[in-house]
From Swiss-Prot:
This is 6-phosphogluconolactonase. The lineage of its organism: Bacteria, Pseudomonadati, Pseudomonadota, Gammaproteobacteria, Enterobacterales. GO terms for biological process: glucose metabolic process; pentose-phosphate shunt, oxidative branch. Belongs to the cycloisomerase 2 family. The keyword Transmembrane does not apply. The gene is pgl. The keyword Lipoprotein does not apply. It holds the Pfam family Lactonase. PANTHER family: 6-PHOSPHOGLUCONOLACTONASE, 6-PHOSPHOGLUCONOLACTONASE-RELATED. Gene3D superfamilies: YVTN repeat-like/Quinoprotein amine dehydrogenase (2.130.10.10). Its EC number is 3.1.1.31.
Amino acid sequence: MKQTVYTASPESQQIHVWSLNHEGTLTLVQVVDVPGQVQPMVVSPDKRYLYVGVRPEFRVLAYRIAPDDGALTFAAESALPGSPTHISTDHHGRFVFVGSYNAGNVSVTRLQDGLPVELVDVVEGLDGCHSANITPDNRTLWVPALKQDRICLFTLSDDGHLVAQEPAEVNTVEGAGPRHMVFHPNRQYAYCVNELNSSVDVWQLKNPHGEIECVQTLDMMPADFSDTRWAADIHITPDGRHLYACDRTASLITVFSVSEDGSVLSVEGFQPTEAQPRGFNIDNSRKYLIAAGQKSHHIAVYEITGTQGLLTEKGRYAVGQGPMWVVVNAY
């Protein structure tokens, strides 16, 4: 298995392309100059394209991924209705979802042969929209509206339109600020990191009564932390055993173990990391975690070790200015 790591640095308008080997070492393959401040990125389900959101001219760009070394070649672009904060796709590679914090909306762009061709739908009124997350069954889009302390739920229609479900939302505690999400591999639970109180909520997708229910809320900060809370990103290992979330003020990554059924998280430890970690990701082998420091202008590679999933630093690498996003592609 080959793996490529992509890092987005909006201040220098660059994507760095890295090869990740089995020992956790990164080798620079390419530096791509992007026509705009590049922020969110996602790889297409078929591994052939990288989709990126740019500003100040709000667009989604598509880059072809070379099958031999992961290098990028520009392929197409499509306009967006707001500054892109988060980007994702459905599991069949038919649609791109873009959440916009500043515009307070989520948009759906149709893909044709892997390329963005037209805007299909826009849902407004999502104050502080920070991500769009499709469930493993490809039916429901979870959209956290950070400033409203709610996660809105939409059914994805066959033609890409978003239809509000009943109930249309679930709510966090006041002042939590739901931000990013991941789903457990067993499809029974979702985990949401809350930016403003640096907590993680565990959502059961369907309890015995057929309802969505928050079954656990866990503080992700050390007991003696007294500064402003500013959580950012969250990811789970492919086997569902370990979960990680980062806080930018503390510049740390919190390590969680996940119960076998996915319903309970336990804090295992805290890993100091690059200054102001805005984004990170986990490789497909479950062996390595790569974190980006928005203020250090570096990325760090950590080995995931032992039954607790604790992190051991393997190396750090200079990237562009203000790195914010990390994605990993395996092929």
